[in-house]
Amino acid sequence: MSDNIRVGLIGYGYASKTFHAPLIAGTPGQELAVISSSDETKVKADWPTVTVVSEPKHLFNDPNIDLIVIPTPNDTHFPLAKAALEAGKHVVVDKPFTVTLSQARELDALAKSLGRVLSVFHNRRWDSDFLTLKGLLAEGVLGEVAYFESHFDRFRPQVRDRWREQGGPGSGIWYDLAPHLLDQAITLFGLPVSMTVDLAQLRPGAQSTDYFHAILSYPQRRVILHGTMLAAAESARYIVHGSRGSYVKYGLDPQEERLKNGERLPQEDWGYDMRDGVLTRVEGEERVEETLLTVPGNYPAYYAAIRDALNGDGENPVPASQAIQVMELIELGIESAKHRATLCLA
């Protein structure tokens, strides 16, 4: 594509407003051209030059739209992505990819048969702390990792009236927060041999999962993934123990908060995390503890890679095949919790 990639965005809820619209608009070589929304006033307040249409079908039928982005309620991902692909569009779907594994596999097969790029927005691969940790492991600083613990905890004791907290398909934090942690674990360590998962509704009036605790078992490693909506005290984001040392990091990547506050890209200081981690290494008989600077996060890298993939200059940053692995663990985790059992991957 020699001209700008023209992007159509479906919906203008939290994910579109906070992540996708500013990241798309801030990527050279891409144009946020059309947004499908029932609230034109809300869209125009942020993006006065963007065309607003009332229904997604107008994006599917627009021959000038190259890429359709779908950050809508989880149970709509499959039908919208399928319709967009069948209309000949390239597609980005927010996480979780779909509600079921079979839906994810069907979309992947459809995209391949049509020669379309299908990508899933697992943006937390570009978190500041995750990039720091990924670098540590690549350099072998911690040695062989035996224990990895990752938390995504919040304090929201009141159940809110929104689709993510209602009891419909794809609701709850096992579908909302856990995909981030599962994707990061797979990126670092690959698929586990087995997993043991506890899912619960702990808040009064909860209609969907608001607590999860997952143990991913590898031959010589345990990965603990934890999320709750009832954590007033701060938990460590990462606790990692290896044969040569440990890494502990508190705090959450700052990019979402900055985007939520309306900051636009590009910015020279983008992604800087002011909270550093602690690296502990054993040298001989001595234990050495040092502050480890956190590298900048880089959410803009996702849409830059999408641009390059559509132009034939690079790889899809998160192909559907990788998101399918996350869906495998989501479904296996639900079965594990249902049967209160450790289950092996097929």
Swiss-Prot record:
UniProt enzyme class: oxidoreductase
GO BP annotations listed: antibiotic biosynthetic process
GO molecular function: nucleotide binding; scyllo-inositol dehydrogenase (NADP+) activity
Record key words, sorted: Oxidoreductase
Record's protein name: Uncharacterized oxidoreductase YdgJ
One Pfam family hit: GFO_IDH_MocA
Domain of life: Bacteria
E.C. number: 1.-.-.-
Signal peptide boundaries: none
Record InterPro entries: Gfo/Idh/MocA-like_OxRdtase_C (IPR004104), Gfo/Idh/MocA-like_OxRdtase_N (IPR000683), Gfo/Idh/MocA_oxidoreduct (IPR051317), NAD(P)-bd_dom_sf (IPR036291)
Family: Belongs to the Gfo/Idh/MocA family.
Transmembrane spans: none
GO cellular component terms listed in the entry, alphabetical order: cytosol
